[in-house]
Amino acid sequence: DRSVSRGLGDVYKRQVQIGEIRDRNDKLCELAKRKETILSTIEEQGKLTEELRKRIEQSWDATEVEDIYLPYKPKRKTRAEAARQKGLEPLATLLLLQRENHLDSRLPAFVKGDVKDEEDALKGARDIIAEQVSEDERARNQLRNQFSRQAVITSKVVKGKEEEAAKYRDYFDFSEPLKRCSSHRLLAIRRGESEGLLKVSISPDDEECAGRLEQMYVRGNNECSRQVGEAVRDAVSYTH
């Protein structure tokens, strides 16, 4: 009977909707707990401003909440943290200002303790800048947007493996926007890559991403700007 099957269909739809609402509610409860943890962690550091509290409390996007938290997250011993402990944060700040044409007169002051020489000082300062850029919400959003709009996945068969890779024939010379690539295709391509039969690349590549971030952070064309540019290129690998 049609009305019975329609009625059963409606019941099933309602059950699905109830399940979806329950899942959504569970996720929101988890996020609320996570936000409490984040707020208390930042408060313990003495860095919780009223504006920061408001931003975290008002956001119900898990990715955004984690991005806001990232600069305050207790860190493992990173290269940037090691550089800070060597007293190189003021040098990183100096480089970021990008006002100095030459650094010759500034660098000797930072060569002390565990800092071996001027190049070591610059490397540490670049590590600090790279970490700051990688934790900057604007930078992360820029790369995310670039990937969602432009990312293209390309696969080619590894030379000489054509016979062995026969089951991946569809992907011997394949290219498609990543957002249109179905999950089963993506899994097959990744499997072919892990078996050493397909060569896979996803663009925009690191160079394009670095170019976008350089537009955001690099001003002028002096020695400081060049150092910041190098740090920004390093930051791209942090943000992947």
Kindly label every feature range from the protein language model.
Residues 3-5:
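Serine residues within intrinsically disordered or low-complexity segments
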Residues 7-12, 239-240:
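Conserved small/polar residues in nucleotide/adenosyl-binding loops
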Residues 14-22:
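Catalytic phosphate-handling regions of large nucleic-acid enzymes and associated NTPases
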Residues 17, 27, 31-238:
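Duplex nucleic acid-engaging cores and interfaces of nucleic-acid transaction enzymes
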